[in-house]
């Protein structure tokens, strides 16, 4: 069995300077990160999803992290391959449903998009040309789009990716980039990640013109036509850390989807005394819904 790209050492290394740690039983990498304002560290699953195996030996993985003086572990599971909820709840201190992911599965009977989306695709194709590209060949244009997105959405933390991250993704054989061009100029791009019958929407960004012309619509259409045979496509969930009733991105994805899946946010306290101390330092309740509580934005 091939290693899932989100669990691979090549992908984990893309998050440098964060240090990858291999969890042997979970068969995945997590990232060691400093706890701001302290000498301590905790760990998180790789963005956007932590792909892990249902192996009771995960308790040994937790012990290894504890011996490495890691305070906590937090991870968002992959709704297409995650262990069942009972396993997650039995092994993690925190396990709660996280986001609804919008999925396209051509084997299901309702495989047509919404009428609204078909109309948007038709209109956008009059203004742009779409095709598969090598991300490395368009990295400057992509970075301009992505840094604009970061600034516009005030994206901070791990998702404020450096150029080196995209350079690493660009050479991964599992990554496919579909781009839209207007009068020959890069207007929108979308990176998709593939693994054994599963396809994941990874990251997307557009120029102002690309957004105005709604180039994302034909890009999604291209992805579905390219991957529909023998694949389930995960478009991801709504924007932000929590779901909202008023979310244009959710409506956009839902219009292409014909199924829904739910993933989980899982957390584990590896050093209880240290966790309590870090929470006390921030003046937060250790039992707060946000995990780890000491990283909340109180």
Provide a role label for each language-model segment.
Residues 72-78, 132-134, 179, 232-236:
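A structural signal for short, well-ordered beta-strand segments and their strand-loop junctions
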Residues 45-53:
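The substrate-binding groove and active-site-proximal loops of carbohydrate-active enzymes
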Residues 2-21, 25-28, 33-39, 90-110, ...:
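Active-site/acyl-donor-binding loops of N-acyltransferases
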Residues 58-65, 118-121, 163-167, 224, ...:
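Short amphipathic alpha-helical segments and helix-helix/interface helices
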Residues 56-98:
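Non-catalytic accessory segments adjacent to catalytic cores
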Residues 1-42, 81-82, 87-211, 227:
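A conserved beta-strand-loop-helix scaffold within acyl/acetyltransferase catalytic domains
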Residues 60, 174-278:
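Aromatic (often tryptophan-rich) hydrophobic motifs at membrane interfaces
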């Amino acid at each position: 069995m091939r290693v899932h790209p989100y669990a691979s050492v090549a992908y984990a290394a893309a998050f440098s300077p964060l240090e990858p740690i291999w969890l042997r039983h979970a068969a995945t990498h997590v990232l060691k990160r400093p706890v701001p304002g302290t000498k301590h560290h905790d760990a998180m699953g790789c963005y956007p999803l932590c792909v892990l195996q249902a192996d009771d030996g995960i308790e040994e993985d937790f012990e290894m992290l504890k011996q490495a003086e890691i305070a906590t572990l937090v991870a968002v599971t992959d709704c297409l391959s995650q262990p069942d909820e009972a396993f997650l709840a039995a092994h993690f201190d925190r396990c709660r449903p996280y986001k609804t992911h919008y999925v396209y599965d051509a084997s299901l009977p309702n495989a047509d998009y919404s009428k609204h989306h078909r109309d948007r695709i038709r209109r956008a194709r009059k203004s742009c040309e779409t095709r598969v590209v090598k991300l490395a060949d368009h990295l400057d244009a992509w970075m301009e789009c992505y840094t604009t997105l970061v600034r516009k959405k005030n994206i901070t933390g791990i998702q404020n990716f450096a150029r080196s991250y995209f350079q690493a993704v660009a050479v991964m054989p599992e990554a496919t980039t579909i781009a839209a061009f207007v009068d020959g100029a890069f207007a929108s791009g979308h990176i998709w990640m593939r693994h054994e019958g599963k396809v994941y929407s990874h990251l997307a960004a557009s120029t102002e013109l690309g957004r105005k012309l709604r180039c994302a619509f034909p890009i999604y259409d291209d992805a579905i036509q390219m991957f529909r045979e023998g694949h389930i496509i995960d478009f991801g969930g709504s924007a932000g850390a929590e779901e909202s009733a008023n979310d244009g991105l959710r409506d956009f994805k839902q219009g292409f989807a014909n199924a829904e899946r739910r993933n989980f946010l899982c957390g584990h306290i590896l050093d209880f005394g240290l966790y309590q101390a870090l929470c006390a330092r921030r003046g937060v309740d250790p039992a707060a819904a946000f995990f780890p509580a000491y990283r909340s934005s109180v």
